[in-house]
């Protein structure tokens, strides 16, 4: 038979997750993925990687937190929530996401209160839709264009998870600022943190928040990570 996973006595979180310490309101704290999620397809007795450049649509997928892989973009909040659930996790609440991003010292960029160029993946020079389609007017950016799988395959766009090793904080979470936007569990549809083109327009660093889209929206720039309640070591 298959051996069941055994948790460490030193951490209440699953592999690939960081433990965020408790507060007076939540003494146990919570767990959050160290890395932006990648996906594996798990329907029809399969367990195979899902392309990070394709929307999962009707496929059954589960979220994975792993270093050194292309994180999943092109994903809606509903799809992200289902992928977290399939992994025994859940999407992070806004407050959980923001606390983990800011780190234990509660700083705007996690690593500090001042932006340090190059620490995070946030300075891609050319908008990928313009680069790929030569479409400089946003009126020409339709749903099909914004979900083209080639966008995140262009050089200098999305980075491998954890590749920007200093885009982190003492909690040991990576890429919460930049790389891909990240969905939270807000039922109205919220994603946070900015992406490889911008971590400024809708707020600086961990304060970056977009609320313009509903939970079924997806495009190349949006990914996610999962949270979970800690499990007692006893």
What is the role of each PLM region?
Residues 10, 28-29, 106, 158, ...:
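Disulfide-stabilized extracellular ectodomain repeats and their linkers
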Residues 28, 39-45, 118, 192, ...:
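Short, solvent-exposed loop/turn elements at domain surfaces
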Residues 211-218:
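Short proline/glycine-enriched turn/loop segments at secondary-structure junctions
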Residues 77-210:
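Functional-site microenvironments in short loops/helix caps that host divalent-cation chemistry
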Residues 4-81, 85, 100, 178:
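A short glycine-rich, aromatic-capped structural motif
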Residues 22-23, 33-35, 40, 112-114, ...:
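Structured loops at beta-to-helix junctions and adjacent beta-edge loops in soluble globular domains
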Residues 6-7, 14, 86, 114, ...:
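Processing junctions and N-termini across compartments
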Residues 220-234:
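Short, structured beta-strand segments at or near domain termini in extracellular proteins/domains
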